[in-house]
Amino acid sequence: MSAVAPTQKIVPAAPKSLAQLPAAAPKSLAQLPAAAPKSLAQLRAASIRKPAAAQRPAPVTSVFKNVVKESSTLLRFILEPTVVGYANTLRRTMITDVETIAFRADITESGSTSDVRITKNSTPLSNEMLAHRIGLIPIHVENPLDWKPEDYSFSLKVVNDSSNPLDVVAGDIQVLKRRGAEEEPLLVPNVQFFHPDPVTHDTALLTVLKGKLASQEPEMIEFSATATLGTGRENAAFMPVTSRCAYGYSKDDDPERKREIFTLWLNKHKKVNATELEANPTRKAELEREFETMEVQRCYKKDERGEPYSFDFIVESVGVLSPTYIVARALELLQAKVLRYASIDSGDLPDSVKVRPADAKMKGFDFIFQKEDHTMGNLLQTWMELNLIDSEQITFVGYKVPHPLRDEMLLRVGVDSGKDMDARAAVAKAARECAQMFKDWSAAWASVAV
């Protein structure tokens, strides 16, 4: 994957001047200062005020560029100008939040699986393992949001009476569409839901039944299943994309910039003087070839702050949903998600949000968001850092996921006034502006999508 998931530690915003740098690194969460640097790169850029262009997205007509649909399942595009936090938010949402249809194979408290009910299984695979394999079968439903689980039933019964091994595949599953109370269910061609591979023309392999021996009962498998709606955040079976849902920094093809990076690499890592290297063409060619294999990726487009602003996206669908739809749906979901928090500065808080004084030596407040993770935390932190720190509306912003097994995210906001309404206003403003940004992106995507 091209981007590293956000850290679990609270990540503070950059200081506004070198004079504000702390004398020593904090040893604990409580000792975090109001404006600590996040990296050495930010230390160097700390005294440079963020340009206005970084504070709001560019016009919607220029966000998505070079959209190329290489196949029915593969899409490439460039997202610019924006920041890495927003690009990563889009990537993570496509992976975890876009809905698809699958068989749930979770083990319930009674020991059974939720959507897959195995009644006969004489294979070496345990029921749990077999249900897991069944749950990973891609089910082709083009409009998952309109899916009604009660309309279709899936079942399979295979017995191997022969002496040869028998493959049991998804194509063996029988699909029935339920009709009226007095009507017989309609048999539906299973190829509608389980597409064969275009090369082998086979469907997904579930298990293998060994050949029958004279002294033994034949191996068999029998189950029924219900297909339901879910997301990749719940289980990887519902992920609409492959591992090729990623982005990289757009390469800077400026020859002078590339030469500068090459010279720095020679001096720092190879201990070679670039001028002296001109006298040895063979050695120069070797080093240039080595540079082009990996180090050239450090030559990417940067803004005035030295941060990447252009991102090359690749989105590959597992074959059920089109990549164009996946991007559009992710933007729609992001807009709806942040809008839930756009009014926390007025009236009662949503049931999923709690506010308490910050557990630190600073004036501020901790916002605990239920059922949120790094995606929302990094999004809000990025916008507030870019837009509210310099204007002194807040003094600090950072987030963390307190525990990987608890479905919650903590966002810490520092305010000089010490008033919770000021902190709530900052978070609400971030939510509203992010919602507007993703609305603009949706409009831009609709105008260029292929």
Give the location of each predicted region.
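Protein-protein interaction/assembly regions in multi-subunit complexes
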Residues: 2-22, 29, 33-450
